[in-house]
């Protein structure tokens, strides 16, 4: 019972129209088929009357044949018109759906715009920009500090490597340099030669002083 009093939607109306148009197309096709059969029968009757020499009957049948062919031509025109109406109905339905979608979208946008505060939105964007700038500055400062730490650490390691290399070379070259050192810096050549293979820390300090290295 509720369906009887329910208001039809646009889709319901269009569906009914399309159903009626399809029924019309089928009826036109049936009429055309009947006219084609009648056309063939008249052609056969005209040939039959022509063979018997009945000219008057041929004229009457020929007029009927002309009317049948005209009516068959009209069925093609009507069928084309019905097809055009069906296509137009589908296009209108599509346009109405698009309009409905646009109306719904417009309502949604209006509701969103009512709830949105332009001032608060602008303030939020500005705060976001400020905080982003602070983060960038903090990150840059941290990177600079880390770079300085690692650079200092590298210099210290490089300096230590040089000191180690010099100390390693002292043990190898000290015997050659002692040959040119003043005689007061060593007791006897034989004693220096005897200690060349095993030099103590005190010997290294004396030898450095003798070479003029503090």
UniProtKB/Swiss-Prot annotation:
Q: Where is this motif: MIT-interacting motif?
A: 202-212
Question: What superkingdom does the record give?
Answer: Eukaryota
Q: Which UniProt keywords apply?
A: Coiled coil, Cytoplasm, Endosome, Membrane, Protein transport, Transport
- What family does the entry list? Belongs to the SNF7 family.
Coiled-coil-forming residues are: 25-55
Signal peptide extent: none
Per the UniProt record, one Pfam family is: Snf7
Q: Which GO terms describe its biological process?
A: endosome transport via multivesicular body sorting pathway; late endosome to vacuole transport; protein transport
Q: Where in the cell is it found?
A: Cytoplasm, Cytosol; Late endosome membrane
InterPro entries (alphabetical): Snf7_fam
Primary residence: cytoplasm
Its name, as the record gives it, is Charged multivesicular body protein 2b
What is the recorded membrane topology of this protein? Peripheral membrane protein
A single Gene Ontology CC term: multivesicular body
PANTHER family registered for this protein in UniProt: CHARGED MULTIVESICULAR BODY PROTEIN
Q: What does this protein do?
A: Probable core component of the endosomal sorting required for transport complex III (ESCRT-III) which is involved in multivesicular bodies (MVBs) formation and sorting of endosomal cargo proteins into MVBs. MVBs contain intraluminal vesicles (ILVs) that are generated by invagination and scission from the limiting membrane of the endosome and mostly are delivered to lysosomes enabling degradation of membrane proteins, such as stimulated growth factor receptors, lysosomal enzymes and lipids.
Q: How does it assemble?
A: Probable core component of the endosomal sorting required for transport complex III (ESCRT-III). ESCRT-III components are thought to multimerize to form a flat lattice on the perimeter membrane of the endosome.
Where are the annotated segments for Disordered? 178-199
Gene3D superfamilies this protein is in?
Answer: 6.10.140.1230
């Amino acid at each position: 019972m509720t369906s009887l009093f329910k208001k039809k939607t646009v889709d319901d109306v269009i569906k009914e129209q399309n159903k009626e148009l399809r029924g019309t197309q089928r009826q036109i096709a049936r009429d055309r088929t009947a006219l084609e059969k009648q056309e063939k029968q008249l052609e056969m009757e005209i040939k039959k009357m022509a063979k018997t020499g009945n000219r008057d009957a041929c004229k009457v049948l020929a007029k009927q044949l002309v009317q049948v062919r005209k009516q068959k031509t009209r069925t093609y025109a009507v069928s084309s018109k019905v097809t055009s109406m069906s296509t137009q109905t589908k296009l209108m339905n599509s346009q109405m759906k698009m309009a409905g979608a646009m109306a719904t979208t417009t309502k949604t946008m209006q509701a969103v715009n009512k709830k949105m505060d332009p001032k608060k939105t602008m303030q939020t964007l500005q705060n976001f920009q400020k905080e982003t700038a602070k983060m960038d500055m903090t990150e840059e400062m941290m990177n600079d500090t880390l770079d300085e730490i690692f650079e200092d650490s590298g210099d210290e390691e490089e300096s230590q490597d040089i000191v180690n290399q010099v100390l390693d070379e002292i043990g190898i070259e000290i015997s050659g340099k002692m040959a040119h050192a003043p005689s007061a810096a060593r007791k006897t050549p034989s004693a220096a030669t005897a200690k060349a293979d095993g030099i103590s820390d005190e010997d290294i300090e004396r030898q450095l002083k003798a070479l003029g290295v503090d």
